[in-house]
Amino acid sequence: AQLQNLVLKDREATPNDHTFVPRDIRDNVGEVVESTGVPIGESRFTISLRKTSNGRYKSTLKLVVPVVQSQTVNGIVTPVVVRTSYVTVDFDYDARSTTKERNNFVGMIADALKADLMLVHDTIVNLQGVY
């Protein structure tokens, strides 16, 4: 797939579009970034696909979102990353899987991330343990 702009919505009360623009392709990993004008504060999304030696297809999506604040040292204001969140999603398919099967697997994962599915939402958003 051609590396291109990727627009992702957040979950604010009024969702914001986050536009990631192509930055680079290195070792078959495409990278798009949400540019803030300061590279240290850029959110990054990467996507890759590789075929393993045993014929499986593995695709990985990664989202890296830093939180940046201004810091003043000796009267000089500079941006500094105060924390970073990471999400990694791995897909691992048998070479005999069909397009329909793969599409359904992706749909189930996308559906699992809906805010009204409390098991997943409470675990990954509210940081509640599974009991």
From Swiss-Prot:
Which positions in this protein are listed as binding Ca(2+)?
Answer: 2, 131
Localization recorded for this chain is: Virion
Pfam family example for this protein? Levi_coat
Record keywords: Capsid protein, RNA-binding, T=3 icosahedral capsid protein, Virion
Q: Which domain of life is it from?
A: Viruses
Molecular function as annotated in GO: RNA binding; structural molecule activity
A GO term from the CC aspect? T=3 icosahedral viral capsid
Q: In UniProt terms, what function does this protein have? A: Capsid protein self-assembles to form an icosahedral capsid with a T=3 symmetry, about 26 nm in diameter, and consisting of 89 capsid proteins dimers (178 capsid proteins). Involved in viral genome encapsidation through the interaction between a capsid protein dimer and the multiple packaging signals present in the RNA genome. The capsid also contains 1 copy of the A2 maturation protein.
The annotated subunit structure for this chain is:
Homodimer. The capsid proteins form dimers that assemble by group of 5. Twelve such pentamers are linked together with free dimers. The homodimers binds to the viral RNA via an operator hairpin, but also to many other RNA sequences in the viral genome; this interaction probably shifts the virus from the replicative to the assembly phase and ensures specific encapsidation of the viral genome.
Q: Which family does it belong to?
A: Belongs to the Leviviricetes capsid protein family.
Q: What is this protein called?
A: Capsid protein
- The organism is Pseudomonas phage PRR1 (Bacteriophage PRR1)
